[in-house]
Amino acid sequence: VTAPNFPAGWTAVPILGGVNFVTTATNPDSAPNSAFAADPDTVGGGTDLSTPQFPITSNSATVSFRHKYNTEPGWDGGVFEISINNAPFQDILGAGGVFLQNGYNGSIGAGTNNPIAGRQAWNGDSAGYVTTIVRLPSAANGQNVQLKWRFGADNNTAPVGGGWNIDNLVVSGNTQ
């Protein structure tokens, strides 16, 4: 997929006045681009990047993706969410998923206009791309799911050029 497009059916939506996810050819993990949410220093809020729905056909299904983040530690960051059969999105851990590699590394402070305030999240500096692997919840087996990456920021302080890049999503262990 060539920037500025996302793959068919993917959506990017700003929330609470945040800066939207975009595709960028700058620093992708693999060519030609990656999804990127900038970490703003003057605007709070966030952005959601969502997949289209797809079926899960195994109790052992996993999702892996490569991402890098450089955000204001403890105040700006990202989370991974799931919707099963059009139910409201919830954090992957709250839904019963398990991080097998590179799960959340901290939490986001409460009391700001950050839409993920008070939650566990990826934040700070990953120092390059890392691979996250998550086993999907058993409740997803035999169901349609939708995945979402949610980035949130407060309204001050951010690293220069900071944000969150997401690339190379792979769903494994899903029998056809």
Indicate residue ranges for each PLM-predicted region.
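Conserved aromatic beta-strand anchor motif in extracellular beta-sandwich/beta-rich domains
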Residues: 80-84
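Surface-exposed loop/edge segments in extracytoplasmic proteins
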Residues: 87-93
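Extracellular glycan-recognition surfaces and repeat-rich motifs
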Residues: 1-46, 94-130
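Short, charged low-complexity linker/loop segments at the C-terminal edge of domains
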Residues: 90, 173-176
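Extracellular/lumenal ectodomain signal focusing on beta-strand-rich modules
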Residues: 9, 53, 91, 133, ...
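Extracellular beta-strand-rich recognition modules
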Residues: 1, 51, 55-71, 78, ...
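Extracellular beta-strand ligand-recognition surfaces/modules
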Residues: 65, 117-159
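Extracellular carbohydrate recognition
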Residues: 44-47, 75-77, 127, 154-174
